[in-house]
């Protein structure tokens, strides 16, 4: 082998190198999360707290990716002779040089997106200005409850997080954060919010607060990082480079604004009964929870987690010092008792509350759909563009597709396929629209990756799941939910994908219905579960 290029997308790695990478990506997760917890949560620095480093999300971590690359190269060189290795940064070149004498080239694919930074700044300035002009100031006279909510480019009148549970409840106010909305849509939202129980953060944020949050772009270069060792590897330079790249910048700015919002509410003597956060333990959430737990020490803070297990989205996992630093809610609200084990992997002191499963309650009313399609499959896409591209490309190579069988693609509601997939699709690939459950209930076979709510809706509808990429996490996620292995298959190659497409399509529907009742036992039934004291 003449050269090894580690700067390409993972889907373009050789099979052998990809297998090493996936193994380290899986096996080093706990050590990495504990390292971040130990080095960045014992004493809180606000700018570090809202940086991508502290988010400790391996799915998007530049640091963790390069650690895995380092160990994969080391392992690979034990088996193969390589003339040239191409890496992304000086850190890898310097550390690989200790055990490799060949040519090492640096190809910096990761650069600061100056246009993206300008776009983010402009969006925040516009949202701040338009909100100040259009939004009515709401007078808060008594103790109230605040509800953290995100407004996406779906119908903003339908709350996809709490299913309008808090709408028009006098003592509850929604605190919205806009996600991927254009200015026209934001104006429409603001006019609607004026008539409903919504409070804009901008009502309590000043121009100084806006500039402070945006100035994070410049302050991040002044953050001091001491030597930080992962095993015997000093990763300080990797951490500094991730900070330099301003990863997840928009979330960092929102996290700071959430913190300042809590601070300003306290300074204006606003009395609170409770605070509810839609909690994925992201840096947006950390700013929110650290703010309210710092300035409202006696107010109960709740984090609602209306989803299942996704160990690759490792920000969800609360770690020990993080818990003690109060950057997470005091109470975690889960939609099924089976989730306690997964959520308390790193710290056992978490206070759990069994809560309503708003996203899944409609499934209790659904009947098993016996008329399933025997000769077509469906791909469910998520928000990971690279993974989606790899899934589509793999399915295109199957014999099932080569034989002309129809493959449907269900796009993620927040990400259209045309925005990232620029290759031609075969004529037998078709985009399908409609309500997710009403679509997937007709299919025996669902192709996907990750552990989004769509996976569990698929299982509840009686579908079998095929994961065409083996990164070990899909298997771990479903094991933690006690999903029988007969209901899914993690495949290692194209032949396995074809084998299990054929196997599942040819199974009698009696093999599909069993798991619906089993998984429903893992989801809280609203008839037996209260949410904030109400059904």
Which ranges hold each PLM region?
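Catalytic-core helical/loop segments in enzymes performing group transfer/polymerization on anionic/lipid-linked
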Residues: 1-535
